[in-house]
Amino acid sequence: MMQDLRLILIVVGAIAIIALLLHGLWTSRKERSSLFRDRPVKRAKKARDETPLDELDEGVGEVRVKGARSQQNEPSFSSSSFDNASFDNHSAREELRSEATSPFEHLSPASSYDPLLDEATPVDSPRSQVRGDSNPQVVNPRETPIQPSIDTPRESFAYDAPPSAPQQPAAHSLHEKVQPAPAQPQQPAEPVEPVAAKEAVLVLHVVAHQGGVIGGELLLQSLLQAGFQFGEMNIFHRHVNPAGAGPVLFSLANMVKPGSFNVDAMSEFSTPGVSIFMMVPSYGDASQNFKLMLQSAQRIADDVGGVVQDDERRMMTPQKVESYKARIRDVLKANA
C-alpha cells in the first residue's frame, strides 16, 4: 500500500514538474512574440513623431491633406485578449512586412503593451496637426506618381557675361608682328690670309747625350773659338766682328734657369745644354746670320760631344732647316 502511494506521488510530482516546464516555455515564447511585435510599432511611432506631416506631404506630390485637429481614441487591449490570442513567429513577420510596405496608412499611434503586466498601459501619442477636412484622405505614395520637376533657367543666367571673342585673329596678328623678316643670303667671306709676323725668334739647342752634362771649361773654350764674347745679361753674344765689336747677330744662354753664366766659376759649372737664339729681322742679311748660327751650333756640339736640336727639342733635319728659312722670308716680306 505504501509503495503504491509512493509511486502515485512520484508520478504526480513528475507530471507537475513537466507542466511547470511547459508553462514556462509557453510563457517565454509568448513574451518573445510580443516583444518582436511591439518593437517595429514603437520604431514607426517614433519616426512619425520626429517627422512633420508637412514634409511627408511634400514627398507625395501635389496632394495636400487639410483639416482640423482630430483626435482618435487609442485602442485599448486587455490581458484577456492577449491570453486568448496565439502569436507565433509567422504572424509577427507578416505584421512587420505589412507595416513596412505602407507606413503612411497607419496614422493612429499604436499602443504599447507589456505582457509582463496584468493590465495594458496605453501611451498617449502627441497630437498631430492635420490641415484639411474632418475626414482626411491619405493617398498611398506608391499609387500617385511623382511629377518630375523641370528646373527652368533662372534670371541670373540672363546676366551672364557674353562669350569672349575668339583669340585666333589676335594670335595671328601677333604672329605677323613677331615673324622676322627673311634674312638676305650672305655672301661667302673671302679667305683672309694670315698676317705674317713682323719679327720672329729662331732657337737652336745644343744638348749633351742622354744622361750626360756639358762641362764648364770645355764649353767656355768652344764658345771662345766660335767667336762668342761674354757680355750683357751674363750671357754670351756673337757680334759682327769676332773680336766683340759691332752689332749682335745672335746670343747663347744656359738652358737651366736663370740662363746666365758665371765666368769666374766655369771650372765648377756643368749644364745639360745651351740655347742659341737670334732675332729676325737683324743686322745684315738674316739668312746669312742664321746660316752662321747653325754652323756655330754644330761646331759647339762637336766640341762638347752633344747634338743639335730644333725649337721643339727634336733632332735637326734638313726639312726643319728649310722651315726656318721660310719663316725668315715671311718676316722679311712682312717688313718690306
Curated annotation (Swiss-Prot):
Biased composition, class Low complexity, residue ranges: 76-89, 179-190
Membrane topology value: Single-pass type I membrane protein
Biased composition (Basic and acidic residues): 40-51
Gene Ontology CC terms, in alphabetical order: cell division site; plasma membrane
Keyword set includes Methyltransferase: no
Cytoplasmic compartment segments: 28-336
Keywords assigned by UniProt, alphabetized: Cell cycle, Cell division, Cell inner membrane, Cell membrane, Membrane, Transmembrane, Transmembrane helix
Disulphide-bridged cysteine pairs: none
One GO-annotated biological process of the protein: FtsZ-dependent cytokinesis
Tree of life domain: Bacteria
Stored SMART domains: ZipA_C
Biased composition (Polar residues): 126-138
SUPFAM superfamilies hit by this protein: Cell-division protein ZipA, C-terminal domain
Subcellular localization(s) per the UniProt record: Cell inner membrane
Keyword Thylakoid: no
Region (Disordered): 40-190
Side of membrane Periplasmic, spans: 1-6
Main subcellular location: membrane
Transmembrane spans: 7-27
Assembly mode: Interacts with FtsZ via their C-terminal domains.
Family: Belongs to the ZipA family.
Function noted in UniProt: Essential cell division protein that stabilizes the FtsZ protofilaments by cross-linking them and that serves as a cytoplasmic membrane anchor for the Z ring. Also required for the recruitment to the septal ring of downstream cell division proteins.
Listed NCBIfam families: septum_zipA (TIGR02205)
Name recorded for this polypeptide: Cell division protein ZipA
Organism whose genome encodes this protein: Pectobacterium carotovorum subsp. carotovorum (strain PC1)
Top-level taxonomy: Bacteria, Pseudomonadati, Pseudomonadota, Gammaproteobacteria, Enterobacterales
